[in-house]
């Protein structure tokens, strides 16, 4: 068979590390949902600002916005 049986006595628990101990409080909130909208409006603002940033970069790339002193090929 391809499967292997492990005895209960020889099985060790999870290994404790310093990084794991530091990150454990962050994982303790797993599965909990804040009531209401939470930070959804903040995320919407961040997405809108990112869209504006991308449109500015696109306009510069397409030479729609002319910048003084910068030559575009």
UniProtKB/Swiss-Prot annotation:
Sequence ranges of Polar residues compositional bias: 1-11
Residue numbers bearing the Phosphothreonine modification: 3, 5
Region (Disordered): 1-21
PTM notes: Phosphorylation is a light-dependent reaction catalyzed by a membrane-bound kinase; phosphorylation occurs on Thr residue(s) in the N-terminus of the protein.
GO MF annotations, alphabetized: phosphate ion binding
SUPFAM superfamilies: Photosystem II 10 kDa phosphoprotein PsbH
Recorded GO CC terms: chloroplast thylakoid membrane; photosystem II
Cited InterPro entries: PSII_PsbH (IPR001056), PSII_PsbH_sf (IPR036863)
Subunit note: PSII is composed of 1 copy each of membrane proteins PsbA, PsbB, PsbC, PsbD, PsbE, PsbF, PsbH, PsbI, PsbJ, PsbK, PsbL, PsbM, PsbT, PsbX, PsbY, PsbZ, Psb30/Ycf12, at least 3 peripheral proteins of the oxygen-evolving complex and a large number of cofactors. It forms dimeric complexes.
Summary of the function given for this chain in its UniProt record: One of the components of the core complex of photosystem II (PSII), required for its stability and/or assembly. PSII is a light-driven water:plastoquinone oxidoreductase that uses light energy to abstract electrons from H(2)O, generating O(2) and a proton gradient subsequently used for ATP formation. It consists of a core antenna complex that captures photons, and an electron transfer chain that converts photonic excitation into a charge separation.
NCBIfam families in the cross-refs: PRK02624.1
Protein name, UniProt field: Photosystem II reaction center protein H
Organism this protein belongs to: Helianthus annuus (Common sunflower)
Primary gene name: psbH
């Amino acid at each position: 068979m391809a499967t292997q049986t492990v005895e209960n006595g020889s099985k060790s628990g999870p290994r404790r590390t310093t990084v794991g101990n530091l990150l454990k409080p962050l994982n303790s909130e797993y599965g909990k949902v804040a009531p209401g909208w939470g930070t959804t409006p903040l995320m919407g603002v961040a997405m809108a600002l990112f869209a504006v940033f991308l449109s500015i970069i696109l306009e510069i790339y397409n030479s729609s916005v002319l910048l003084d002193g910068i030559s575009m090929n």
